[in-house]
């Protein structure tokens, strides 16, 4: 190839470029944001070096990674971010611990869930609201896990 591309870039349709470790531990043991960012940048660069020029993120804080790649700050593939999953109470994406209050009930907290991984939504209206808010924040696709 003489240092030139041999084929068009690959597309990976299911990646988590900015999520590390078992998801059940992230709400309690998240990496420091600087370390987390450095690992995400390294992972994105590795994807690009492996020939993936476009990836579809299916959950995790990849929108921030996408922004710095798009701005030319770091090398990486084109990212189509999902960011938050939409899940139901006690569904596959509900990572609350036993004593954590429900985030949609008075006194509950959104903290980790709304910012990084999961939006808990029950019923049609809550799912529509969650999807509209996610797309309004720059998501390009949405993952629903029940």
Question: Regions from the language model: what does each represent?
Answer:
Residues 73-146:
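Metal-coordinating catalytic core of metallo-dependent amide/deamination hydrolases
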Residues 1, 50, 58-59, 82-83, ...:
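Active-site-proximal beta-strand/loop segments in catalytic clefts of secreted hydrolases
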Residues 4-71, 90-96:
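Metal-associated gating/positioning segment near the N- to mid-region
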